């Protein structure tokens, strides 16, 4: 029984799904997808639970969420192993994900009060008040790269605001989704407040097509996000929050410490085997001898990166990709770039057939035209050289995406220029592109999305503002507008 609907664990009525470790092939989880009828059942359960959940005090909802945080802490080792085994990422990185889940809860509580709490302004004849109200029933679609942390970036603020939820994890990480849901169950959520439906495309389409949804919160690829946007077009009554991918530029303008700049670049491009939406996909490197030296050092250090199993000792920097298919897609993308005229500096290699262990790749594309503006979700870095900083900014902005952007330079003036001209939601200076503060908004513009999940601004799309003018009594104004006559004399 792998679906949680209305407080009960039930068996899916859809197709059988089997999840294997992407490196060893070990069977980790199996269960049946939710069919359309079960998706509808989950929605009805969420709708029935909504009035009572929304009417609880914020403190009562907070108690449950903080209880969940405590369960994350006490089950950290077990959840770390589940996430690592299912995604293929190393144990150390999965542990940081669980820690982020825990830390984000206190931040979400504070964000609710600061961004969507209550305000009151006294007026001579009463008061003006601002309150926030939950939308109702929300669908949450989770990604596979951070199957615990990123869905919770939607779920926690949505629950705090008083919404009820239908959660569909990625079909590639059903085990992590179930493990997190069992902790929510232990936290004492009332039946129907949070429901779990497992499945792939058919389940997702059934969920997004529900008429009784009040909104949909999504983290994932731009292609799927665009499909959801089209599906919900013409329905302004539904909130749609999209956090999608990026074709992110990292500008290396000048680096006094080449090794430090190489370290920053590797952290930006290859951490999580390149499976972060903020990863650097495009390296924009200043022409000249220093750029040549940097590039040679980057290739030399990157070729030492050997992906390993989740529990290898010593621990590897990167593990496998989410699947063998995902790894092969990166190799195919590299081969296509070579065919277009790219010059391979470091070829990505599948270490073992039937696994997702893929070494990083670096390819120079300077002078090549017609390069697709797409996100290759893996450890593949494309390099372009530029002559001046204005050209670098133009190249950085030459994308339909707008998630993250970074600059390596000792010059504050150049960073100030980038802040003014960059089209990206995250702009870092001498910091990895993959670094983001949990107390800051997370997200981008253009094809990268429309709202800011998993952090400070998530509260904004989980509740709607209600403005009120209030007075505890009603009296006739001392001064009336022209044309109004409330005298006792009857005019005939």
Swiss-Prot record:
Keyword line: Arginine metabolism, NAD, Oxidoreductase
Catalytic activity: N-succinyl-L-glutamate 5-semialdehyde + NAD(+) + H2O = N-succinyl-L-glutamate + NADH + 2 H(+)
Transmembrane segments: none
Associated pathway: Amino-acid degradation; L-arginine degradation via AST pathway; L-glutamate and succinate from L-arginine: step 4/5
MF terms in GO: aldehyde dehydrogenase [NAD(P)+] activity; succinylglutamate-semialdehyde dehydrogenase activity
Membrane keyword on record: no
Superkingdom field: Bacteria
Entry annotation: catalytic residues: 243, 277
Residues given in the record as NAD(+) binding sites: 220-225
E.C. number(s) listed in UniProt: 1.2.1.71
Disulfide pairings: none
Enzyme class: oxidoreductase
Protein name: N-succinylglutamate 5-semialdehyde dehydrogenase
Organism expressing this protein natively: Escherichia coli O7:K1 (strain IAI39 / ExPEC)
Gene symbol of the encoding locus: astD
């Amino acid at each position: 029984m792998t679906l949680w609907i209305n407080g009960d664990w039930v068996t899916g009525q859809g197709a059988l799904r089997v999840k294997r470790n992407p490196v060893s092939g070990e069977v980790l989880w199996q269960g049946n997808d939710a069919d359309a009828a079960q998706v509808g059942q989950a929605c009805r359960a969420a709708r029935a639970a909504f009035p009572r959940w929304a009417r609880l005090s914020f403190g009562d909802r907070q108690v449950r969420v903080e209880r969940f945080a405590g369960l994350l802490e006490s089950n950290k080792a077990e959840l770390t192993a589940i996430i690592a085994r299912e995604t293929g990422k190393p144990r150390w990185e999965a542990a940081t994900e669980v820690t982020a889940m825990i830390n984000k809860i206190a931040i979400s509580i504070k964000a609710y009060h600061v961004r969507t709490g209550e305000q009151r302004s006294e007026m001579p004849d009463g008061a003006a008040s601002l309150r926030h109200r939950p939308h109702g029933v929300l669908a949450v679609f989770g990604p596979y790269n951070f199957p615990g942390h990123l869905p919770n970036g939607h779920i926690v603020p949505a629950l705090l605001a008083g919404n009820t939820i239908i959660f569909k994890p990625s079909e590639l990480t059903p085990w992590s989704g179930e493990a997190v849901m069992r902790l929510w169950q232990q936290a004492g959520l009332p039946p129907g407040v949070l429901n779990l439906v497992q499945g792939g495309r058919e389940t997702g389409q059934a969920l997004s097509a529900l008429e009784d949804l009040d909104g949909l919160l999504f983290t994932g690829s731009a292609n799927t996000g665009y499909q959801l946007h089209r599906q919900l077009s013409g329905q302004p009554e539904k909130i749609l929050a999209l956090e999608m991918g990026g074709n992110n530029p990292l500008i290396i303008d000048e680096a006094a410490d080449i090794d430090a700049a190489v370290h920053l670049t590797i952290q930006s491009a290859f951490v999580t085997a390149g499976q972060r939406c903020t990863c650097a996909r495009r390296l924009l490197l200043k022409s000249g001898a220093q750029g040549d030296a940097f590039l040679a050092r980057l290739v030399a250090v990157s070729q030492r990166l050997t992906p390993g199993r989740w529990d290898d000792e010593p621990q590897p920097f990167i593990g496998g990709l989410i699947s063998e298919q995902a790894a092969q897609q990166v190799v195919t993308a590299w081969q296509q770039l070579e065919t277009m005229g790219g010059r391979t500096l470091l070829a990505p290699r599948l270490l073992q057939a039937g696994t997702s262990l893929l070494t990083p790749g670096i390819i120079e594309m300077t002078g090549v035209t017609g390069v697709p503006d797409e996100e290759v979700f893996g450890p593949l870095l494309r390099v372009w050289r530029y002559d001046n900083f204005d050209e670098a900014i133009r190249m950085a902005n030459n994308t339909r995406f707008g998630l993250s952007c970074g600059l390596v330079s000792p010059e504050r003036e150049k960073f100030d220029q980038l802040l003014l001209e960059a089209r990206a939601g995250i702009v870092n200076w001498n910091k990895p592109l993959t670094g983001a503060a949990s107390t800051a908004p997370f997200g981008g513009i253009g094809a990268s999305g429309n709202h800011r999940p998993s952090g400070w601004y998530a509260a904004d799309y989980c509740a709607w503002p209600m403005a009120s003018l209030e007075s505890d009594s009603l009296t006739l104004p001392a001064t009336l507008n022209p044309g109004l006559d409330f005298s006792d004399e009857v005019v005939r």
